[in-house]
Amino acid sequence: MELNVLLLLLCLSGGQVGAVEETLMDTRTATAELGWTANPSSGWEEVSGYDENLNTIRTYQVCNVFGPKQNNWLLTTFIPRRGAHRVYVEMRFTVRDCSSLPNVPGSCKETFNLYYYETDSNIENKISTFWNESPYLKVDTIAADESFSQVDFGGRLMKVNTEVRSFGPLTRSGFYLAFQDYGACMSLLSVRVFFKEMPSVVQNLLVFPETMTGAESTSLVIARGTCIPNAEEVDVPIKLYCNGDGEWMVPIGKCTCKAGYEPENHVVCKACPAAMFKANQGMGICAQCPANSRSTSEASPICICRNGYYRADFDTPEAPCTSVPSGPRNVISIVNETAITLEWHPPRETGGRDDVDYNIVCKKCRADRRACSRCDDNVDFVPRQLGLTDTRVFISNLWAHTPYTFETQAVNGVTNKSPFPPQHVSVNITTNQAAPSSVPIMHQVKATMKSITLSWPQQEQPNGIILDYEIRYYEKDHHEFNSSLARSQTNTARRTGGRVWMFMSVQVRARTVAGYGKFSSKCGFQTLTAEDYKSELREQLPLTGSAAAGVVFIVSLVAISIVCSRKRTYSKEAVYSDKLQHYSTGRGSPGMKIYIDPFTYEDPNEAVREFAKEIDVSFVKIEEVIGAGEFGEVYKGRLKLPSKREISVAIKTLKAGYSEKQRRDFLSEASIMGQFDHPNIIRLEGVVTKSRPVMIITEFMENGALDSFLRQNDGQFTVIQLVGMLRGIAAGMKYLSEMNYVHRDLAARNILVNSNLVCKVSDFGLSRYLQDDTSDPTYTSSLGGKIPVRWTAQEAIAYRKFTSASDVWSYGIVMWEVMSYGERPYWTMSNQDVINAIEQDYRLPPPMDCPAALHQLMLDCWQKDRNSRPRLAEIVNTLRPMIRNPASLKTVATIPAVPSQPLLDRSIPDISAFTSVDDWLSAIKMGQYRDNFLSSGFTSLQLVAQMTSEDLLRIGITLAGHQKKILNSIQSMRVQITQSPTSIA
């Protein structure tokens, strides 16, 4: 089966295949009477004759040249069209020269007319109504290139004329041909009716089916192609255009061989043999399996690792399989009281990898070492416990006089693939005596006007018998060098001799035979005020009175703490209450989500936490650089969240050495995007802020920015496809407008396109307030960037008045960019020239072949009065019926000859500067077509100004980009001729 397919593809791909002519009728093959109908009967006559090769043929002849007002009709039989949209008629005939006929009146002719009548049924019952011109459609008047005379006739010199005419479009089941003679002496030797069909073709791993030509000579019929077996699509959908002359144009789209297959002669994808592989789809060839791997079957996309060898998750299929490392060597331990330093040499075998790291396993053991358990979390490892790249680690905060076991593991990228534990080396140590750990907390037991009583719990690691405690006191705002010291044999202390309402800071530390531990953290306490004098008197009363006073004091402390707590809570609530009140004044509908500016938060990080999801950096894989932004590079990568499938993402990074303001500005875009949820708005996946570099992660758009995507595919989309893109952009902007969000930088470069041609609004970097007091003539924004003058409304440039109406103006410019396939608005004009022209009511002209309805919508968006511009919801409602009714887009806009209306293309030179067609073509860099113009008769600029796209095709200019450039110049030429009717060449 595969061999048969291969042979078929090889046959189809051989050489350039031209159109096939499928015959519908051919009188040369007739062996009996043709049976055509003639009227009157004295006109056309069917006879048997001979062609120039003396083959017997059935012909029709007529020669009533001596009678006046001849009107002889000849009607063929019904001809089925067999699905053809356009048919061709090849007529072979001879005509007698009227001047060679003696005494012939002036009614003698040397031409005849060809007509056709399209029908679904036979017309024999109403044949009488067909002997005049009214029911027919005229194809052409046929004239002979050569005629014969009496001398020629006597010498049997046949001067046969061959003419081919075509007509269409055809929609009925079939048609009749009619020949009208009105005074000629001629013979219709043969008539062949045929249509053109493109045969199947294989090009560059693409297969295109048989395709009929279009109904018009300029028609381009799309043939949808498929990939050959074991190939897959790349880029845009596959198609090939068949022109009206039956020629295949350049194919669009691409197929490449699947993983496991390689191309052969560009017509088949052949499976990789055993012991070879191909990992990715593409035009690459199969390769030998990498080291320590093998493939046992054909068409392998990857080679399987041999036993004991593995590939890491991040290894490519082209990478060799590797193994785990051996254990570290020569481990040395240095114990210092309750800390230890471990050092070692790298393993002898790295497993063939260069990503060897080290892990430390800490175990605390009993004195006899018969049982060990994992160390507590408070043990410190410097620089860290896992993923060490150096061969040294410092471990502290261990228990004193305690046996420990430390395992030093060597790991690499495939250790987690092995079923066995990592190779390691163990060392056993016992810590020495050490000073006690610090006191964790202090409590105030009692306070008077001049004294404070304190207590504290025993520390977690006394590391021996506590001999005593040292307490350090100093007043608030005094340096600790001005402190006073006291000692206590217990875990309580009383400070006396203070002042009324004195605030003091207190620290305490314990002492063992190993010395003092560290001082505790500072704790603040204070004596009572004069108003609490009664409390001091109660201290001198019996025990009952003292107890009562203590109860009162404790209650007051609880009350104060409650009041303070409520005050803090109220303060926090008040901040959010103000914020909610501020944002509830928007114009959104009830229940509609309203945009919140992240710059209104006192702490911008709070906005990031509220609107953006934090993503662990281990879930992110960076693959390649795809661009650079204001804050750093942009990458393509992969995101694999738990319990979710892996997806492609775009990753914006914050470059090193950033300031806090740059970090805030960078993350503000995530705070903005995180508030949006719409199919035409770029989706935020999350942010990475807890590691470096800081990242913003969004969905990945395969086709990139809209402007460059359109330029790369110039002329490749239908008007309906372009309007569909515009409707998607408008829907996204409508959503933003309903959230009371103003974009401020809407342009085709800030629209991203995915593989399904869905357009999504992106780049929210300029969408924050501009400085109101700036007087910089370059219109510097608060970001330090420039206002995009070519896309910005008049009031936004002049007064910094950014609204949804100014976004509508920008949307009109985006429409112009889309319909012009990514041309630069206002071409090479300077920003100041653009501003001046707009103020004088100049507007952009319609792009080539732009529907009038779309250009009118652009002009509506560019109304000087912002209140007169359509709302984004109205724009969506305007575009929707255009897609449903493509007929509304057939009327193409033209440039009016009124200077106050659309702006002229300033990049095209003045027509008066040219003296010839040659000069003009050289000026627009199209001099290679000089001979095409001159040989076709377009020898003056006056004639060139009348040319159409059909004329360009006819003279051999087939490249869409060149047609567009020449037609733009011709369009400008017409306007300049109309406005300044001077004499031109």
UniProtKB/Swiss-Prot annotation:
SMART domains: EPH_lbd, Ephrin_rec_like, FN3, SAM, TyrKc. The chain crosses the membrane at residues 543-563. The active site is at D745. Glycans are attached at N336, N428, N482. It is a single-pass type I membrane protein. InterPro entries: Eph_TM, EphB1_rcpt_lig-bd, EphB1_SAM, Ephrin_rcpt_lig-bd_dom, Ephrin_rcpt_TKs, FN3_dom, FN3_sf, Galactose-bd-like_sf. It is an enzyme of class 2 (transferase). A motif (PDZ-binding) lies at residues 983-985. Gene3D superfamilies: ephrin a2 ectodomain (2.60.40.1770), Galactose-binding domain-like (2.60.120.260), Immunoglobulins (2.60.40.10), Phosphorylase Kinase, domain 1 (3.30.200.20), Transcription Factor, Ets-1 (1.10.150.50), Transferase(Phosphotransferase) domain 1 (1.10.510.10), Tumor Necrosis Factor Receptor, subunit A, domain 2 (2.10.50.10). ATP binds at I626, G627, A628, G629, E630, F631, G632, E633, V634, K652. Residues 20-542 are extracellular. Residues 21-203 form the Eph LBD domain. Residues 620-883 form the Protein kinase domain. Residues 912-976 form the SAM domain. Keywords: ATP-binding, Cell adhesion, Cell membrane, Cell projection, Endosome, Glycoprotein, Kinase, Membrane, Neurogenesis, Nucleotide-binding, Phosphoprotein, Receptor, Repeat, Signal, Transferase, Transmembrane, Transmembrane helix, Tyrosine-protein kinase. Heterotetramer upon binding of the ligand. The heterotetramer is composed of an ephrin dimer and a receptor dimer. Oligomerization is probably required to induce biological responses. Belongs to the protein kinase superfamily. Tyr protein kinase family. Ephrin receptor subfamily. This is Ephrin type-B receptor 1-A. It comes from Xenopus laevis. The lineage of its organism: Eukaryota, Metazoa, Chordata, Craniata, Vertebrata.
